[in-house]
Amino acid sequence: MAIGLIGRKVGMTRIFTEDGVSIPVTVIEATPNRVTQLRTDETDGYTALQVTAGDKKANRVNKAAAGHFAKAGVEAGRGLWEFRLDGNEGEGIEVGSEITVEIFAETKMVDVAGTSKGKGFQGAIKRWNFSHQRNSHGNSLSHRAPGSIGQNQSPGKVFKGKKMAGQMGNKRVTVQSLDVVRVDAENNLLLVRGNVPGAPGGDVIIKAAVKA
C-alpha cells in the first residue's frame, strides 16, 4: 500500500497492558487528509495522489495556492504532499474526498518519516560518536579533534563522505517498522510504539511498513 497519511507529532506518553507492562508510545494527530489532485501518466508522467492536511489562515495563502485548493473544492491546508501509486492503487478516490486514520485499522506496523531536530554545527564526537583523544600524556590541544582525515600524497585528497564536523540534524529521517498500538478514529489519533523523528508539532508522513 503506497497511500499514506500526513500527521502531526503530539508527543510521547506510555500506556499499560493488562499485565501491567509499560509501553512507550508516540501520539500522532492525523486529521483527515483532503485529496487536492490526482496525477496521471498521461498528464504528469507518473501516477500519484496529492493531499493536504490541517488548516491555514486565508491571508497566509497566496493566489496560486488558493486557486489550487478552490479548484479541488477543499479547505486550504498547511502544505501539499504526494503519495506515488502503483497499479490500481487509488481506485475510487476522487478529488475532494478525505483519507482518515482508519486506513491503518488493519495495519500492524508503519514507517514514519519526519524532520529531525536541528542541532546546529557540531563536532565529530557529538555528530558521529567518535572517541575523544587522551586528556593528558602530551595532548594539550586535541582532546576532541577528529584526527587524521586522509593519507598522503597519494591519493592527495579527502574522500567524499568523510565524517567530519558540520551541520547535525534538521534532515528527513525515516523510522521503519513501528508497531501500531492503537487507532483512535474518533479523535483522529494514531499511537505507535517508540519514538518518531522531530519535535512535537512537526509534520510526519505515515505509511504501511515495507518490511512488515
UniProtKB/Swiss-Prot annotation:
One cellular component (GO) term of this entry: cytosolic large ribosomal subunit
Region (Disordered): 134-155
MF terms (GO), sorted A to Z: rRNA binding; structural constituent of ribosome
Pfam families to which the protein is assigned, alphabetical: Ribosomal_L3
PROSITE patterns noted in UniProt: RIBOSOMAL_L3 (PS00474)
Post-translation changes: Methylated by PrmB.
UniProt KW keywords: Methylation, Ribonucleoprotein, Ribosomal protein, RNA-binding, rRNA-binding
Modification N5-methylglutamine, positions: 153
GO biological process: translation
Assembly notes: Part of the 50S ribosomal subunit. Forms a cluster with proteins L14 and L19.
PANTHER family: 50S RIBOSOMAL PROTEIN L3, LARGE RIBOSOMAL SUBUNIT PROTEIN UL3C
Role, per record: One of the primary rRNA binding proteins, it binds directly near the 3'-end of the 23S rRNA, where it nucleates assembly of the 50S subunit.
Family under the similarity heading: Belongs to the universal ribosomal protein uL3 family.
Full protein name: Large ribosomal subunit protein uL3
Organism: Pseudoalteromonas atlantica (strain T6c / ATCC BAA-1087)
